[in-house]
Amino acid sequence: MHWQTHTVFNQPVPLNNSNLYLSDGALCEAVIREGAGWDSDLLASIGQQLGTAESLELGRLANAFPPELLRYDPQGQRLDDVRFHPAWHLLMQGLCANRVHNLAWEEDARQGTFVARAARFMLHAQVEAGTLCPVTMTFA
């Protein structure tokens, strides 16, 4: 049974099902101003996908279940393995699919590619920030 004890009035509505790119006017303007306007359609598509309730839930799960160090198996044999929640892997796959790890280093890179990559990075950061560390190290 659920008891109604009070009315919550000081919290924003959940950010479910919004376009994280198109709802950020400053980011849209900066992308165009800094020479990556050619990527606006793809950024809008990425922003729509990342703004879904499902994507935001993946971010929550990745943070609720941090990586787990497995030093030994049940028989005492050394493992030295790290187990990640499936949400972490799905978020990493999205980062790679959106080329956040290598966009500016592609052979077909053009003016504004670093800006486009930074915008994609910012969109993913709104969902979950921990996955951005290995992607940044790969990009460096």
Q: What residues fall within each predicted segment?
A:
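Extended, charge-enriched "interface" segments that sit outside catalytic cores
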Residues: 1-110
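Glycine-rich flavin
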Residues: 88-140
